[in-house]
């Protein structure tokens, strides 16, 4: 008979943030004797679950996908926007071999460097600061012919806000003494995602042939003419920017073309028009053999260079457990099952060796305020049985209630959800202690602690950027460390289990055994 295992259990109370203010705070308003006692008597700390600490832009609220990726990875996992911001700030961007290689090859052959992308401060599909950095990279490396093809936004930015951005780039080119804005067109044409190829064709012709419906001497003049035609940024018609005596910027074989959008969905169609030999969306008037670089991978089947391929996460918590022949269980309701499996495993769909999974069906109700306890009783029953089974070295569980009921904006329901969770935590903590295991209780982001927006007085249904609790229950004498974040959880668990922490995990243990 094998020895019974004493599991390391991680319970993630989804959407269970920490907020001092009591007003409109479902967690404070709920009767939670169990969590109150644990917070009062057990080692605990507060950890960051939003913004830069989880790889999101500064002060941006956390979310479940990002939260679980960070929890399982044991390192900050940067989202594309933040990853690029960081790369540009520390100048790694300017040494990116794919970008520098494309620019150098074009420059050495006397060819042009074309840069295209959504000129926007919206940060949803792209960011104009990244495009500016690309212009600087091309100029620094000695490219003489630098052409910017600006797709205008007006959806993730105000409808008529492109002028200041275009001015900034025209001033930049003037200061460099080389390069120019060569075309402008609304994202409605250049960034279609619904196979409306007639739109994409207009953008393709503008770029490849330097032909459009309109022409202007400067980008700002072209934009003002569009406004006079009653076209907002998003719908600006294909406009060639070319002053008297300037050469045209039509693309030629051997030119470099760098696409500076980082979000894939609206970048794919125009990319395929340039890259796919068998492209049939429309009859291309000019097929041009450019050195095409995607900033990120827009689709696995688009075969061209990628400056920032998807980061594959090596030695996540789940993978490290498997490599060390440990058994693990992932358990949640339908609503958060993908989070404790796929996202916690760093985007890996298949389970690791020794990894079991239990899915509890979430209740079939229109909205969860109608059943705020959700399926927590059944989930707890299965979790307690797994803890007592002696089968698992570690168990990861997510209770969705705080988040799913928090999203409804119904305060009374959120209070009931939190009270249901308190009973569950009591059962789980008792089970863990009865087998000599260890338990960490935390959250992936906040939600239920802020049920009304103080600015508008309306229901607050979104996540928050507040910290989340972390509590230790177990027989080890530990001291909490301040200033933690979600990516410290995996190293904390490994440390409490007496295991080595892989070097890829840059997070730090938050409970030190004394």
From Swiss-Prot:
One of the entry's Gene Ontology molecular-function terms is: manganese ion binding
Q: What domain of life does the native source organism fall in?
A: Bacteria
The pathway where this protein functions is: Carbohydrate degradation; glycolysis; pyruvate from D-glyceraldehyde 3-phosphate: step 3/5
The free-text cofactor remark is: Binds 2 manganese ions per subunit.
Which residues are listed for Mn(2+) 2 binding in this entry? 14, 64, 444-445
Q: Which residues bind Mn(2+) 1?
A: 403, 407, 463
* Pfam families linked to this entry: iPGM_N (PF06415), Metalloenzyme (PF01676)
A Gene Ontology term for the protein's cellular component: cytosol
Active site (catalytic residues)? 64 (phosphoserine intermediate)
User: Which top EC class applies here?
Assistant: isomerase
Q: Which UniProt keywords apply?
A: Glycolysis, Isomerase, Manganese, Metal-binding
For activity, the cofactor(s) needed are: Mn(2+)
- Which EC number(s) does UniProt give? 5.4.2.12
Q: Which reaction does it catalyse?
A: (2R)-2-phosphoglycerate = (2R)-3-phosphoglycerate
* Binding residue positions for substrate: 125, 155-156, 187, 193, 263-266, 336
SUPFAM superfamilies referenced in this protein's UniProt entry, alphabetically: 2,3-Bisphosphoglycerate-independent phosphoglycerate mutase, substrate-binding domain, Alkaline phosphatase-like
**What processes does the entry annotate via GO biological process terms?**
glucose catabolic process; glycolytic process
**InterPro entries associated with the record:** Alkaline_phosphatase_core_sf, BPG-indep_PGM_N, Metalloenzyme, PGAM_B_sf, Pgm_bpd_ind
Subunit comment for this entry? Monomer.
Query: Which family is this protein grouped under?
Result: Belongs to the BPG-independent phosphoglycerate mutase family.
- What is the recorded function of this protein according to its Swiss-Prot or TrEMBL entry? Catalyzes the interconversion of 2-phosphoglycerate and 3-phosphoglycerate.
Name of protein: 2,3-bisphosphoglycerate-independent phosphoglycerate mutase
Q: What is the lineage of its organism?
A: Bacteria, Pseudomonadati, Pseudomonadota, Gammaproteobacteria, Enterobacterales
């Amino acid at each position: 008979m094998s020895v019974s295992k004493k599991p390391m259990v991680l319970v993630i109370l989804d959407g269970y943030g920490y907020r001092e203010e009591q007003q409109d705070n479902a967690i404070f308003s709920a009767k939670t004797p169990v969590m109150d006692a644990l917070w009062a008597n057990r080692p605990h700390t507060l950890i960051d679950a939003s913004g830069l600490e989880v790889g999101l832009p500064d002060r941006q609220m956390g979310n479940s996908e990002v939260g679980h990726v960070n929890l399982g990875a044991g390192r900050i996992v940067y989202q594309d926007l933040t990853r690029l911001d960081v790369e540009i700030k520390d100048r790694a961007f300017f040494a990116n071999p794919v970008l520098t290689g494309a620019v150098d090859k074009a420059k050495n052959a006397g060819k042009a460097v074309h840069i295209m992308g959504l000129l926007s401060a919206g940060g949803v599909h792209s960011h104009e600061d990244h495009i500016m950095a690309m212009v600087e990279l091309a100029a620094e490396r000695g490219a003489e012919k630098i052409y910017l093809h600006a797709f205008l936004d007006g959806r993730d930015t105000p409808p008529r806000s492109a002028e200041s951005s275009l001015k900034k780039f025209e001033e930049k080119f003037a200061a460099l003494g080389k390069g120019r804005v060569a075309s402008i067109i609304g994202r409605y044409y250049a960034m279609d995602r619904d196979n409306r190829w007639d739109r994409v064709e207009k953008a393709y012709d503008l770029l490849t042939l330097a032909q459009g419906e309109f022409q202007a001497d400067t980008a700002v003049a072209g934009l003002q003419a569009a406004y006079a035609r009653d076209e907002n940024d998003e719908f600006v018609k294909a406009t060639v920017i070319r002053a008297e005596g300037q050469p045209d910027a039509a693309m030629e074989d051997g030119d470099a073309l760098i696409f500076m959008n980082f979000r894939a969905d609206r970048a794919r169609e125009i990319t395929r028009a340039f890259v796919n030999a068998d492209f049939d969306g429309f009859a291309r008037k000019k097929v041009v053999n450019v050195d095409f670089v995607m900033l990120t991978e827009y689709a696995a089947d688009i075969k061209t260079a990628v400056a920032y391929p998807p980061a594959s996460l090596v030695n996540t918590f789940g993978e490290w457990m498997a490599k060390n022949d440990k058994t693990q269980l992932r358990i949640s309701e339908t609503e958060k099952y993908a989070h404790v499996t796929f996202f916690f495993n760093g985007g890996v769909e298949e389970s690791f060796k020794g990894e079991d999974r239990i899915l509890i069906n979430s209740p079939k109700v229109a909205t969860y305020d109608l059943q705020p306890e959700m399926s927590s009783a059944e989930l707890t029953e299965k979790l307690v049985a797994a803890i007592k089974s002696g089968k698992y070295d570690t168990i990861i569980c997510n209770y969705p209630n705080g988040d799913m009921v928090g999203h409804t904006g119904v305060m009374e329901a959120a209070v009931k959800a939190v009270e249901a969770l308190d009973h569950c935590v009591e059962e789980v903590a008792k089970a863990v202690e009865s087998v000599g295991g260890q338990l960490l209780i935390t959250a992936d982001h906040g939600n239920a602690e802020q049920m009304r927006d103080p600015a508008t007085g309306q229901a607050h249904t979104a996540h928050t950027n507040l910290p989340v609790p972390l509590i230790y229950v177990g027989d080890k004498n530990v001291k909490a460390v301040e200033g933690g974040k979600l990516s410290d959880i995996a190293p904390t668990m490994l440390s409490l289990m007496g295991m080595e922490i892989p070097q890829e995990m840059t997070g730090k243990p938050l409970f030190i055994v004394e």
